Amino acid sequence: MSRFIGSTFKKSRRFGFSILETGKEFSKGKKRITTPGQHGKERAKVKVSEYGQQLQEKQKVKFMYGLSERQFRNTFAKAKKMQGILGTNFLVLLESRLDNIVYRLGFSATRQGARQLVNHGHILVNGKKVDIPSYLLSVGDLVEVKASMKKNEKVLEALQNNEATLEFVKVNKNEVKGEFVRLPERNELNSEISESLIVEWYNRLIKK
């Protein structure tokens, strides 16, 4: 399955969940818990099976982080090799991706935009260009926008509008740089994610 690059609002409306984690997709008062389409309300009343709940949760988080199915599955496999709680480790790995930290630092208004900054070589890690969005950062890594992009209108606008206060990252807006201070704790991440359903989904596949 390819990476989703369509309307964020449509996906957020479908899942009743802010993929941007800001609620901006619903800022015009159009938030819906139903699925898109003329008969969304009728479909929403249908009881979702356990399988359906697991699939929906997987899709929701996959779209939120902007990963392809293969990337998502590989990240889960990597989390299984770590000590600790599998679901939490999985989310921590997703959060440790370079494109996600660029987003968390406020250098882009969306994860998709952050991914483009990385892909185009506009991001430095510890002073060196890294153009791989899936690059996993280590605690203490310094992330900054390269000099030629520090006055970019979109970057500055994103920084100005970023009101998030996350303790696992530290940002210097004046210098357009930041630090991955520590690994995030589960209570700092999206409470609307039920990672246990994703664990159950992949465990189901393994048993087949």
From Swiss-Prot:
Pfam families: Ribosomal_S4, S4. Residues 96-159 form the S4 RNA-binding domain. PROSITE patterns: RIBOSOMAL_S4, S4. Keywords: Ribonucleoprotein, Ribosomal protein, RNA-binding, rRNA-binding. This is Small ribosomal subunit protein uS4. One of the primary rRNA binding proteins, it binds directly to 16S rRNA where it nucleates assembly of the body of the 30S subunit. It comes from the Bacteria.
